[in-house]
Amino acid sequence: CSLPVLATFHRKLRAEVPLQNRLEDNDRAPWLLARRLLAESYQQQFQESGT
């Protein structure tokens, strides 16, 4: 895993943390959120590298 991807993931995760309160009824919600944000971080990194 590359450091820029993790930095992007961390930034996105911190931006999304307030959403956790609205998703507490779903035990899997934090994992699904983290998985989505990590995927977006990878995608963003590859888009930046490709341009």
Curated annotation (Swiss-Prot):
GO biological process: nitrogen fixation
UniProt entry keywords in alphabetical sequence: Nitrogen fixation
Keyword Flavoprotein: no
Domain of life: Bacteria
Coiled coil: none
Self-association state and partner proteins as the record states: Homotrimer; associates with NifD.
Function in brief: May protect the nitrogenase Fe-Mo protein from oxidative damage.
Family listed: Belongs to the NifW family.
Name this polypeptide is given: Nitrogenase-stabilizing/protective protein NifW
Organism: Klebsiella oxytoca
